[in-house]
Amino acid sequence: MDYGYIHLIIGPMFSGKSTELIRIVKRYQIAQYKCCVVKYLKDIRYGNSVYTHDNNHVSAISTTLLYDVVDKIMNFDIIGIDEGQFFKDIVSFSENMANMGKIIIIAALDSTFQRKEFNDILKLIPLSEKVTKLNAVCMECYKDAAFSKRITKEKEIELIGGKEKYKSVCRKCYFLE
Protein backbone atom coordinates (compact mmCIF):
# COMPACT_ATOMS: atom_id res chain seq x y z
CA MET A 1 0.00 0.00 0.00
CA ASP A 2 1.27 3.49 -0.85
CA TYR A 3 1.13 5.93 2.00
CA GLY A 4 0.35 9.59 1.55
CA TYR A 5 1.31 12.32 3.94
CA ILE A 6 -0.01 15.29 5.87
CA HIS A 7 1.27 18.84 5.41
CA LEU A 8 -0.08 21.22 8.06
CA ILE A 9 0.14 24.97 7.37
CA ILE A 10 -0.61 27.00 10.50
CA GLY A 11 -0.41 30.59 11.62
CA PRO A 12 -2.50 33.63 12.54
CA MET A 13 -5.02 35.47 10.42
CA PHE A 14 -3.52 37.20 7.35
CA SER A 15 -0.34 35.11 7.35
CA GLY A 16 -0.88 33.56 3.92
CA LYS A 17 -2.13 30.10 4.89
CA SER A 18 -4.81 29.91 2.20
CA THR A 19 -2.41 31.45 -0.32
CA GLU A 20 0.14 28.72 0.44
CA LEU A 21 -2.54 26.02 0.26
CA ILE A 22 -3.68 27.25 -3.16
CA ARG A 23 -0.08 27.56 -4.39
CA ILE A 24 0.69 23.96 -3.43
CA VAL A 25 -2.55 22.59 -4.91
CA LYS A 26 -1.99 24.45 -8.20
CA ARG A 27 1.56 23.06 -8.34
CA TYR A 28 0.21 19.52 -8.02
CA GLN A 29 -2.37 20.28 -10.73
CA ILE A 30 0.43 21.31 -13.10
CA ALA A 31 2.09 17.97 -12.31
CA GLN A 32 -1.12 16.21 -13.46
CA TYR A 33 -2.34 15.12 -10.01
CA LYS A 34 -6.07 15.04 -9.38
CA CYS A 35 -6.70 17.72 -6.76
CA CYS A 36 -9.64 18.98 -4.75
CA VAL A 37 -10.08 21.55 -2.01
CA VAL A 38 -12.55 21.34 0.86
CA LYS A 39 -13.78 24.41 2.73
CA TYR A 40 -15.88 24.96 5.82
CA LEU A 41 -19.59 25.22 4.94
CA LYS A 42 -20.32 27.99 7.45
CA ASP A 43 -17.76 30.29 5.81
CA ILE A 44 -20.14 31.80 3.27
CA ARG A 45 -18.02 34.85 2.41
CA TYR A 46 -16.89 33.51 -0.98
CA GLY A 47 -19.52 31.00 -2.11
CA ASN A 48 -18.09 27.66 -3.30
CA SER A 49 -14.49 28.84 -3.53
CA VAL A 50 -11.52 29.36 -1.28
CA TYR A 51 -10.28 32.92 -1.65
CA THR A 52 -7.10 34.51 -0.39
CA HIS A 53 -7.04 38.06 0.92
CA ASP A 54 -5.48 39.11 -2.40
CA ASN A 55 -8.39 37.58 -4.42
CA ASN A 56 -6.63 34.42 -5.63
CA HIS A 57 -9.08 31.50 -5.53
CA VAL A 58 -9.91 27.88 -6.31
CA SER A 59 -13.27 26.13 -6.37
CA ALA A 60 -14.03 23.98 -3.34
CA ILE A 61 -16.38 21.42 -1.85
CA SER A 62 -18.19 22.81 1.22
CA THR A 63 -18.97 20.77 4.33
CA THR A 64 -19.00 20.90 8.12
CA LEU A 65 -17.73 17.32 8.53
CA LEU A 66 -15.00 15.95 6.29
CA TYR A 67 -16.31 12.39 6.41
CA ASP A 68 -19.57 13.66 4.87
CA VAL A 69 -17.75 14.28 1.56
CA VAL A 70 -15.59 11.14 1.43
CA ASP A 71 -17.50 9.79 -1.57
CA LYS A 72 -16.88 13.02 -3.49
CA ILE A 73 -13.12 13.10 -2.85
CA MET A 74 -11.95 9.48 -2.97
CA ASN A 75 -10.90 9.77 -6.63
CA PHE A 76 -8.51 12.65 -5.88
CA ASP A 77 -4.80 12.27 -5.10
CA ILE A 78 -4.43 15.60 -3.33
CA ILE A 79 -6.94 16.91 -0.80
CA GLY A 80 -6.53 20.50 0.32
CA ILE A 81 -8.46 21.60 3.39
CA ASP A 82 -8.94 25.29 4.21
CA GLU A 83 -9.91 26.56 7.68
CA GLY A 84 -9.01 23.14 9.08
CA GLN A 85 -9.45 24.30 12.68
CA PHE A 86 -13.24 24.25 12.25
CA PHE A 87 -13.56 20.57 11.28
CA LYS A 88 -14.30 18.36 14.30
CA ASP A 89 -13.09 15.26 12.42
CA ILE A 90 -9.87 16.81 11.02
CA VAL A 91 -7.48 14.52 12.93
CA SER A 92 -9.01 11.12 12.17
CA PHE A 93 -9.95 12.12 8.61
CA SER A 94 -6.45 13.37 7.77
CA GLU A 95 -4.74 10.36 9.32
CA ASN A 96 -7.05 7.87 7.58
CA MET A 97 -6.76 9.55 4.18
CA ALA A 98 -2.95 9.78 4.41
CA ASN A 99 -2.81 6.10 5.36
CA MET A 100 -4.85 5.37 2.21
CA GLY A 101 -2.27 7.13 0.04
CA LYS A 102 -3.77 10.62 -0.17
CA ILE A 103 -1.70 13.78 0.19
CA ILE A 104 -3.50 16.01 2.68
CA ILE A 105 -2.65 19.71 2.84
CA ILE A 106 -4.34 21.64 5.63
CA ALA A 107 -4.40 25.40 6.18
CA ALA A 108 -5.53 26.32 9.70
CA LEU A 109 -5.31 28.79 12.51
CA ASP A 110 -3.13 27.35 15.26
CA SER A 111 -4.76 29.37 18.02
CA THR A 112 -7.93 31.24 18.88
CA PHE A 113 -8.12 34.99 19.41
CA GLN A 114 -7.44 34.13 23.09
CA ARG A 115 -4.14 32.42 22.11
CA LYS A 116 -5.47 29.01 23.10
CA GLU A 117 -5.25 25.90 20.89
CA PHE A 118 -7.98 25.89 18.26
CA ASN A 119 -10.05 22.73 18.71
CA ASP A 120 -7.97 19.66 17.73
CA ILE A 121 -5.77 21.19 15.03
CA LEU A 122 -2.54 20.99 17.06
CA LYS A 123 -3.09 17.23 17.51
CA LEU A 124 -2.10 16.94 13.85
CA ILE A 125 1.46 18.09 14.50
CA PRO A 126 2.80 14.68 15.62
CA LEU A 127 0.92 13.01 12.75
CA SER A 128 2.22 15.35 10.04
CA GLU A 129 5.25 14.81 7.84
CA LYS A 130 5.56 18.56 7.33
CA VAL A 131 4.45 21.51 9.45
CA THR A 132 4.78 25.07 8.19
CA LYS A 133 4.25 27.88 10.72
CA LEU A 134 3.65 31.22 9.00
CA ASN A 135 3.71 34.69 10.51
CA ALA A 136 1.80 37.75 9.41
CA VAL A 137 2.75 41.42 9.73
CA CYS A 138 1.60 43.14 12.92
CA MET A 139 -1.14 45.56 11.95
CA GLU A 140 -0.04 47.89 14.77
CA CYS A 141 3.79 48.09 14.69
CA TYR A 142 4.61 46.15 11.46
CA LYS A 143 6.86 43.55 13.13
CA ASP A 144 6.31 39.80 12.75
CA ALA A 145 2.86 38.81 14.00
CA ALA A 146 2.18 35.35 15.41
CA PHE A 147 -1.26 36.03 16.86
CA SER A 148 -4.81 36.89 15.78
CA LYS A 149 -6.57 39.55 17.85
CA ARG A 150 -10.32 40.02 17.73
CA ILE A 151 -11.30 43.67 17.48
CA THR A 152 -15.03 43.20 18.15
CA LYS A 153 -16.87 42.32 21.37
CA GLU A 154 -18.14 38.84 20.43
CA LYS A 155 -16.89 36.09 22.74
CA GLU A 156 -17.70 32.86 20.85
CA ILE A 157 -14.70 30.95 19.51
CA GLU A 158 -16.13 30.24 16.05
CA LEU A 159 -16.66 33.69 14.53
CA ILE A 160 -15.84 33.81 10.84
CA GLY A 161 -14.60 37.12 9.51
CA GLY A 162 -11.76 39.15 8.08
CA LYS A 163 -10.28 42.57 8.77
CA GLU A 164 -13.61 43.80 10.10
CA LYS A 165 -13.28 41.39 13.07
CA TYR A 166 -9.59 40.52 13.43
CA LYS A 167 -6.09 41.84 13.08
CA SER A 168 -2.73 40.11 13.17
CA VAL A 169 -0.49 41.28 16.01
CA CYS A 170 2.88 40.64 17.61
CA ARG A 171 3.24 39.64 21.27
CA LYS A 172 3.60 43.23 22.51
CA CYS A 173 0.64 44.58 20.54
CA TYR A 174 -1.56 41.64 21.52
CA PHE A 175 -1.71 43.05 25.05
CA LEU A 176 -2.34 46.66 24.05
CA GLU A 177 -5.93 47.93 24.24
Curated annotation (Swiss-Prot):
Enzyme class: transferase
GO terms for MF: ATP binding; metal ion binding; thymidine kinase activity
Binding-site residues for Zn(2+), renumbered to this chain: C138, C141, C170, C173
Catalysis performed (reactions): thymidine + ATP = dTMP + ADP + H(+)
Binding site for ATP: G11, P12, M13, F14, S15, G16, K17, S18
Amino acids binding substrate: F113, I157, E158, L159, I160, G161
Gene Ontology BP term (one): DNA biosynthetic process
Keyword field: ATP-binding, DNA synthesis, Kinase, Metal-binding, Nucleotide-binding, Transferase, Zinc
Residues at the active site: E83
The keyword Magnesium appears for this protein: no
EC id: 2.7.1.21
InterPro entries the UniProt entry points to: P-loop_NTPase, Thymidine_kinase, Thymidine_kinase_CS
Protein family (similarity comment): Belongs to the thymidine kinase family.
Protein name: Thymidine kinase
Native source species: Sheeppox virus (strain KS-1) (SPPV)
Lineage, uppermost ranks: Viruses, Varidnaviria, Bamfordvirae, Nucleocytoviricota, Pokkesviricetes
